[in-house]
Amino acid sequence: MTTTTTATTATTRRPRTTSTTSTTSTSTAPDLPDELLAVLKRMRLPYLRDAAPEVLATARAQRWDPAEVLRVLITEEIRGRDDATRRMRRKAAGLPAGKTFESWREHDSTIPPGTQTGLATLEWVGRAENLAIAGPSGTGKTHFAEALAHKVIDVGMRVSWFTLESLTAAIGRATVDGSVAKTIARITRAELIVIDDIGMLPAGQAAGEAFYRVVDAAYERRSIVVTSNLHPSGFDTIMPKTLATATVDRLLHHAHVVLTEGTSLRLSEATAGRGVVPLA
């Protein structure tokens, strides 16, 4: 994330923010000269270009120091680029439902509060450690994993999100066209790889191989989150034992294992009438 310094002289009058502080509205701010617009376009500074008319009008009215004008304009460009990068990475990650920590109900989860807080720091991602979340359906496993994934993107890292079925399909397509190594490399460019809902459907040889390939390639290099209704030690009941043993060995070597309990939160919402918008 970009950190913006705020040092200034006592005589510098500065805005509270860099985007909505102008005493001159954007409708009356003068347009930039065509020559300057062309230069900014050539320099690929679209966010600075968009912000410049209002910023310059405000700077003129409030008599900003020139260095402050430059700082604000550059900050707008950085902010715009960071926002665009996050949008691009969210789209590329393939996150399922837009569930973040804003909608996460910490007190409804059986994950200990201290564990939730510790995982939300993302320090474990920096250490290339893994996370296995296991428990009954509807106990918040996917929501918590997706909230972590969004936060990873927010702090400037990348995410690859799969179900075991979609991962198997991706590796299967790569096997057909001979691009398995390239596909694995693309997946493991992400600092966090999430494989969701392992165990919901039977997994055969192809699924076991795909899972193993990714875990092996990421081992001690990237963080993996898996969610499952099974503890990872039981993965040999849904996929070939040899592959499951080798995969789980690598997965759990540097892993936090979190167990969820209780009844389905989705079912509780449904029975309480909170799963839909009232019709009247």
Enumerate the predicted regions with their spans.
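N-terminal pre-Walker A segment at the start of P-loop NTPase domains
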Residues: 99-120
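Charged, compositionally biased N-terminal leader segments and the immediate start
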Residues: 1-47
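Conserved hydrophobic/aromatic pocket- or pore-lining residues that grip, position, or stack substrates
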Residues: 104, 145, 163
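Interdomain "pre-motor" coupling segment immediately N-terminal to P-loop NTPase/helicase cores
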Residues: 37, 41-96
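Active-site signature of alpha/beta-hydrolase-fold catalytic machinery across serine-
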Residues: 147, 151
